[in-house]
Amino acid sequence: MKNVMIVLFMLVNFAYNPGPLPAQAVKEIGRFGIALDEASFPQNSPENLRKSLLKAINSDKIEYMLAHLADPSFIDKNVREVHEGNFAKQVAETREKLKKGLKSPLESLLKEGKLNASEKSASLKDPALKDFIISMKLENNKWYMENNKK
């Protein structure tokens, strides 16, 4: 209901004042209707992104992880081209992959992986998980998990 009220406010505001959207309204609506929560899921450093990813997985906040912690351009393209614009299908697919065996190595890598970071990119690696790497990138002053499959 809160999101509906914000959208209505923005429409009325735009009709009478066609300028940029208020930053607070954009922040509350968020991506795919998922509000940004920088206090609970900080991503201002690779280490904080690591902790936020682990927290999102452990608390089953897959929607949040995909909307805000994963590479936005990859998620947008995947939702549009693979899931016919349906974000819920992307979330369901990711949940299914986690259930089918991805969750355990992902958690292990997020907890135990060695972080190698540069100014604009980072990666988590663990020799015990040979080919399993988490890549990260800095974009618009936020760190995101990148898709390794290009």
Model-found features: residue ranges?
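Hydrophobic beta-strand residues in large extracellular and virion-surface proteins
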Residues: 53, 57, 65, 115, ...
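Sec-dependent N-terminal signal peptides
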Residues: 4-12
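Surface-exposed, charged secondary-structure patches
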Residues: 41-42, 74-133, 149-150
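Short beta-strand edge/turn micro-motifs at domain boundaries
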Residues: 21-28, 130-150
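Stable alpha-helical elements in mature extracytoplasmic
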Residues: 45-53, 61, 65, 83, ...
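Short, low-complexity N-terminal intrinsically disordered segments enriched in polar/charged residues
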Residues: 18-59
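Short, well-ordered alpha-helical segments enriched in acidic and aromatic residues
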Residues: 61-76
